[in-house]
């Protein structure tokens, strides 16, 4: 789960990372009140989980509370790379002398943690990594040891920090590691980490990504979820513990197993080229236990997507046999009743496939068409979706 900047700031503060005052606002009036409370120069910052806010006009320096009101009014509701701005953060202005970069992340390729640090912050780090890779220090971090004093010293030495900021940067890096470890994050990034005119080290802009697999250790993380911006279908799927991702097509996809579902997306996209260029509408993995309730929940999510014109159920029976899947489909259609109003193409294969097909044949549901192969099912589902467009 990616956090908004204001959430990352609050998390940093809770772990002792030096930050400036920041107040989140939902309206221009709240922004003005926040600016008055903070006092002096403030920065109005759009709260979206995407980069490029400044270039899009989502970050403005306000010299007065009235300016904060004006800027917040302009920024709220703004679209930044497809993300609508629902909140702004009013942050205390800073006298910046130098800008640095620091991050610690999960290095999946090497099955390790990685710290990255540079004395050239405030820029797009991806550009710096390509154009001047020597300016970005990369230090492996042993998960069993973490970033202690010695490791922090190694990081700042590799990055080339000046002697006058070493102590402050080292202490801040250790506290950012504390955030990473104790909050079960997969990314903690500060860009920029700054030295102010009076010599302080501050984290001015932070990004945090939390590991959803560790949510059971952090019941407080639930309050950090962005329910306002969440896709309602994805939220509904999450409530039913379904692995669902909404896409932009017309053919709903249900399968068991991520690999099979991804393959199904490919064959549907290919088949769609012959049928009006229709595309998959979603990724939905119901997992191994395709019970009637699970199937009903999956169908309910997909059928509530107005873009969906047909549904392709592609299941390979393994631990869950095809007859159990077929019974689940039949019962799911009974549960959904009239809300099941779009054609379904069902392809079953694997364990007890003949019995599964017999159950669907005898049920003789008017919306269900069976397919013998995945290619046949994808072609039929694409054809039906195109006809319904």
Swiss-Prot record:
Molecular-function GO terms, alphabetical: ATP binding; magnesium ion binding; succinate-CoA ligase (ADP-forming) activity; succinate-CoA ligase (GDP-forming) activity
Signal peptide residue numbers: none
Free-text comment on the cofactor: Binds 1 Mg(2+) ion per subunit.
Residue intervals of the ATP-grasp domain: 9-236
InterPro entries hit by this protein: ATP-grasp (IPR011761), ATP-grasp_succ-CoA_synth-type (IPR013650), ATP_grasp_subdomain_1 (IPR013815), Succ-CoA_synthase_bsu_CS (IPR017866), SUCC_ACL_C (IPR005811), Succ_CoA_ligase-like_bsu (IPR005809), Succinyl-CoA_synth-like (IPR016102)
Cysteine disulfide partners in this protein: none
Pathway: Carbohydrate metabolism; tricarboxylic acid cycle; succinate from succinyl-CoA (ligase route): step 1/1
Binding site for Mg(2+): 191, 205
A cellular-component GO term for this protein: cytosol
One Pfam family hit: Ligase_CoA
Cofactors (names): Mg(2+)
Enzyme Commission number: 6.2.1.5
Binding site for substrate: 256, 318-320
Aminoacyl-tRNA synthetase is among the record's keywords: no
GO biological process, one term: tricarboxylic acid cycle
Reactions performed catalytically: succinate + ATP + CoA = succinyl-CoA + ADP + phosphate; GTP + succinate + CoA = succinyl-CoA + GDP + phosphate
Keyword line: ATP-binding, Ligase, Magnesium, Metal-binding, Nucleotide-binding, Tricarboxylic acid cycle
Family: Belongs to the succinate/malate CoA ligase beta subunit family.
Subunit structure: Heterotetramer of two alpha and two beta subunits.
Function: Succinyl-CoA synthetase functions in the citric acid cycle (TCA), coupling the hydrolysis of succinyl-CoA to the synthesis of either ATP or GTP and thus represents the only step of substrate-level phosphorylation in the TCA. The beta subunit provides nucleotide specificity of the enzyme and binds the substrate succinate, while the binding sites for coenzyme A and phosphate are found in the alpha subunit.
Identification of the protein by name: Succinate--CoA ligase [ADP-forming] subunit beta
Source taxonomy: Bacteria, Bacillati, Actinomycetota, Actinomycetes, Micrococcales
UniProt gene name: sucC
């Amino acid at each position: 789960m990616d956090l908004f900047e204001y959430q990352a700031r609050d998390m940093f503060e809770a772990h002792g990372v030096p930050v400036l005052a920041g107040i989140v606002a939902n309206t221009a009036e709240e922004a003005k009140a926040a600016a008055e409370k903070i006092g002096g120069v403030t920065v109005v910052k759009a709260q979206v989980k995407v980069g490029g806010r400044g270039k899009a006009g989502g970050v403005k320096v306000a010299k007065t509370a009235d300016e904060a009101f004006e800027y917040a009014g302009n920024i709220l509701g703004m679209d930044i790379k497809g993300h609508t701005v629902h909140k702004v953060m009013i942050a205390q202005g800073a006298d910046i002398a130098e800008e640095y970069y620091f991050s610690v992340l999960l290095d999946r390729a090497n099955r390790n943690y990685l710290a990255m640090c540079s004395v050239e912050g405030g820029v797009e780090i991806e550009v710096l990594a390509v154009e001047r890779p020597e300016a970005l220090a990369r230090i492996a971090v042993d998960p069993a040891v973490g970033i202690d004093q010695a490791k922090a010293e190694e990081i700042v030495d590799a990055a080339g920090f000046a002697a006058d900021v070493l102590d402050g940067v080292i202490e801040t890096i250790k506290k950012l590691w504390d955030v990473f470890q104790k909050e079960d994050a997969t990314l903690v990034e500060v860009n920029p980490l700054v030295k102010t005119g009076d010599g302080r080290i501050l984290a001015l802009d932070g990004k945090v990504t939390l590991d959803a697999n560790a949510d059971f250790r952090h019941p407080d993380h639930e309050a950090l979820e962005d329910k306002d911006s969440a896709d309602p279908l994805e939220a509904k799927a999450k409530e039913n513990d379904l692995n669902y991702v909404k896409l932009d097509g017309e053919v709903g996809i249900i399968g068991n197993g991520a690999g099979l579902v991804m393959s199904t997306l490919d064959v549907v996209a290919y088949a769609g080229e012959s049928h009006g260029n229709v595309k998959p509408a979603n990724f939905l993995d119901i997992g191994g236990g395709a019970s009637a309730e699970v199937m009903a929940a999956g169908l309910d999510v997909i059928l509530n997507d107005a873009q969906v014109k047909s549904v392709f159920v592609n299941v390979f029976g393994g631990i869950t046999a095809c007859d159990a899947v077929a019974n689940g489909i039949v019962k799911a259609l009974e549960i959904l009743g009239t809300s099941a109003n779009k054609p379904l193409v069902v392809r079953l294969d694997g364990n007890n496939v003949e019995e599964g097909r017999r159950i669907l044949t005898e049920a003789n549901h008017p919306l269900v068409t069976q397919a013998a192969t995945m290619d046949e099912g994808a072609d039929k589902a694409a054809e039906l979706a195109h006809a319904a467009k």
